[in-house]
Amino acid sequence: CVEDFPYYKSVGYGGLPNEEMIVELDAGYMDGNTMVIGAVAGIKDFANPISIAKELSKDTVNCVLVAEGAEKYASKKGFERKTMLTDRAKQHYRKRVKEVREQELKPYDGHDTVGEVALDCAGKIVAGTSTSGLFMKKAGRIGDSPIVGGGFYADSEVGGATATGLGEDLMKGCISYEIVRKMKEGMGPQEACQRTVDELDAKLKKSRGFAGDLSVVAIDKDGNYGCATNIQNFSFVIYRENEEAKVYLANCIDGKTVITAASQEWMDQYMQERMAPISE
């Protein structure tokens, strides 16, 4: 499980902490058949927040819980408690504090979400997210990941989408819902993703002069996928039954997303960078 792999610093065990050096996790889940949702935000010291979010989706009300309320629920349901702050994450934190002090860099460096949209053989679409959020965020900060329509959305009659990037900006466009809405109107997933990212990127730049990172992935009810981004080297994976998983890179070139297969060299370098010793 990605949430359990300590070298992915944007999610679960090994995720980067907030400004108080505490790991706060967010996760969300949606079933496109029944439209049920579940989400947790600001939850501490639980190993797999996406599983807690899925369990919450079984409830008609009280299906989105935060902080202490989410932790009490998880304990009652028997979910595993685990200290999520690793020694490696502490090293990242100390290094960033030093860089902020000595180089006047911004503390908010590093944000990513593990998002997934899946279609099964019966036509059911689900979407989910899990993240430790913005590195050195303020305690209690919540981004788009656990917000239905922002970080994730699923409708089995149409498709599903998930998003990653700067949560405060992604939420402003209800970006995952907007992609699914466009697909419902007849757009394919690639066009829906590209148009939605373009529109939000342009609106943010018009209103304040810049846009944060915006990256999205979607599938339609027929299993076609799309991806769009306003950054460089956004990676995503496509997996089909009885096939090997394929890693792709998306790059924003002249305002449009160009998707290419990731080379083995790129994937090796990716893992080397994540597992390399940290120099403080």
Regions found by a protein language model. Give the residues of each.
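Alpha/propeptide regions of enzymes that mature by internal proteolysis
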Residues: 1-280
